[in-house]
Amino acid sequence: MLIAIKTLLHTLLLPPGALLLLATAGAYLIARRGAGVRARRTGWALLAAGLATLWLLAIPLVSDALGRVAQRCPPLDLTRPVEAQAIVILGGAAGRLGAPEYGGEPAASQRLLERINYGGFLARRTGLPVAVSGTPTETLAMSASRARDFGVRTRWVEDRSRDTFENAQFCAQLFAPLGVTRIVLVTSADHEWRAMQEFVGAGFSVVPAPVGLYVPPEMGPHSFLPNVAALAYSTAALYEILGDLARQVFAALHLRRHPR
């Protein structure tokens, strides 16, 4: 139930859905028969606010600023030895169970593949064993892709988790009998900070290993022109900012607590 509520809130609070709903409400007030002057003014204000905010989130100038807020973990320093017992790669970007281009084998999504690639790179560089954590679809895609495309085997699979909180909780249960408490945590750069807080809360010592760090282009006239990539990046950044805020609220109200 909580996952379903979260999914609904994501649709209602994040662009473009939230802003399109706002603009649609404004258009309805404007076009409604018998609408008074005040209702029409409110409608125009809602329509303008929805479209203007959508435009702002779709320009690189704004998406870059949001990205800097969301990406709070620096890249892993590869010049220093990594003090950890395992590498944990998080899901969160579901792949496909039957990809026709791979002869029906599982395949990872682009965002998930980025995490797998970096996790494999770190595994080869450090010699540490690898765990994958996510839904059954995500973990199957990750395990298949790692073995097929990168030649790195997965030692542990945690396939019960549906969100970041459960990633941390179920990984703690998986590793407790093994005495594994120090991990390298591989996930997308905008997700790393929130994920790290959840894993620390579950009792882990975490070495953050963000991947896909955004490097903003040079500012110019194009920085004020909307594009789909900037809107997608703004949406991802807002998702993580709101997700971390929700994590703090849940923790303060003791709604979700890691068993220790």
What kind of region is each of these model predictions?
Residues M1-L9, V62, L66-A70, L238-L245, ...:
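Hydrophobic alpha-helical segments of integral membrane proteins
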Residues M1-R32:
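Membrane-embedded alpha-helical segments of integral membrane proteins
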Residues T24-Y28, G43, G50:
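Small-residue hotspots
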Residues R32-T42:
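Membrane-interface helix-boundary motifs at transmembrane edges
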Residues L51, L56-A230, T235:
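A structural signal for short, hydrophobic/glycine-enriched beta-strand patches
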Residues D159, A232-A236, G243-A246, R257-R260:
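Secreted/periplasmic serine-hydrolase-like ester/acetyl group-modifying domain
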Residues P221, L225, L245-R260:
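Extracytoplasmic/luminal low-complexity segments enriched in Pro/Gly and acidic/polar residues
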